[in-house]
């Protein structure tokens, strides 16, 4: 969606909701809030709507209140309160419908209150966080590094025995959820404000382009090669730390090599 169409959609959404007296307010979140990150052609609309008590479910199950609702091709109930909506154009909405009391179940970083008939600004402010993710303790780092090494090993073993789907998820996803928070705290950067304090995988490459490029290059390899490449990054960035589990990393590398030979034999 181009920038003009993106803004127009947001304006029409707000106008329609403001005209409905059952609606108490609207909050745009993430890049839709247009604060630290401006939406681009790949951005969805991320928002939540606060309604009078008792009418929330109607907004979650009927979509006439959405702009261009006749062009919706898919709706998915993601959580009790939240949905994903897909339009024929490929544009997507991610939103939740709350009453005022339910707002406390949400999480926010960037946000803007589009309109508020009472209480929403206070409720949103109470759940919003603009502070960086909490600093990891030495024990946290040790646990995350240990988990990353173990997950690489488990993933490689599954790939080697023919469980490629499961193994690749361990290598390409589970491992990074433990590794990236450690790298974000350890690596130097002129400005870490672009990092997402709710999702450690977001915008990593923007803040750490060199290491981000290494990780992406590893992920573009075959599964065992990806595991090897991620292990290379772990040892390169963290290997000189006093508490780095050098022997464990060497063991994992040995297992990865064995798994690569086993996979090739199949």
Question: What feature does the model see in each segment?
Answer:
Residues 2-5, 65-166, 170:
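Conserved NTP/Mg2+-binding pocket subregion across the NTase superfamily
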Residues 39, 63, 110-112, 201:
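Generic secondary-structure boundary/loop-capping signal
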Residues 21-22, 209:
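Proline-centered flexible-loop/turn and helix-kink motifs
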Residues 1-21, 29-42, 48-96, 101:
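Metal-dependent nucleotidyltransferase catalytic core
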Residues 132-266:
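Conserved nucleotidyltransferase catalytic core and NTase-mimicking acidic/glycine-rich helix/loop elements
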Residues 38-41, 107-108, 197:
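Short aromatic-enriched loop/helix-cap "lid" or pocket-rim segments at secondary-structure transitions
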Residues 28-29, 169:
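Short loop/turn and capping residues at structural boundaries
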């Amino acid at each position: 969606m181009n920038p003009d169409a993106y803004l127009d959609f947001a304006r029409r959404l707000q106008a329609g909701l403001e005209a409905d007296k059952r609606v108490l307010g609207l909050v745009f979140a993430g890049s839709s809030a247009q604060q630290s990150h401006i939406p681009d052609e790949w951005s969805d609309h991320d928002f939540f709507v606060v309604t009078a008590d008792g009418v929330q479910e109607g907004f979650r199950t009927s979509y006439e209140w959405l702009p261009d609702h006749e062009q919706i091709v898919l709706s998915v109930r993601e959580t009790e309160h939240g949905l994903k909506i897909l339009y024929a154009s490929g544009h997507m909405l991610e939103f939740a419908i709350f009453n005022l009391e339910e707002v406390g179940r949400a999480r926010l970083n960037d946000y803007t209150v589009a309109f508020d008939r009472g209480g929403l600004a206070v409720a949103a402010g109470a759940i919003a966080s603009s502070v960086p993710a909490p600093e990891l303790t030495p024990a946290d780092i040790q646990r995350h590094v240990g988990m990353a090494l173990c997950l690489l090993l488990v993933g490689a073993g599954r790939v080697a025995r023919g469980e490629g789907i499961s193994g690749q998820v361990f290598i390409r996803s589970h491992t990074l959820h433990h590794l990236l928070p450690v790298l974000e705290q350890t690596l130097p950067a002129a400005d870490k404000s672009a990092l997402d304090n709710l999702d450690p995988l977001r915008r990593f490459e923007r803040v750490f382009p060199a290491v981000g490029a290494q990780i992406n290059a590893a992920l573009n390899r075959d599964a065992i090669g990806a595991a090897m490449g991620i292990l290379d990054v772990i040892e390169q960035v963290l290997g000189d730390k006093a508490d780095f589990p050098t022997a464990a990393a060497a063991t994992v590398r040995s297992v990865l090599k064995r798994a690569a030979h086993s996979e090739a034999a199949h």
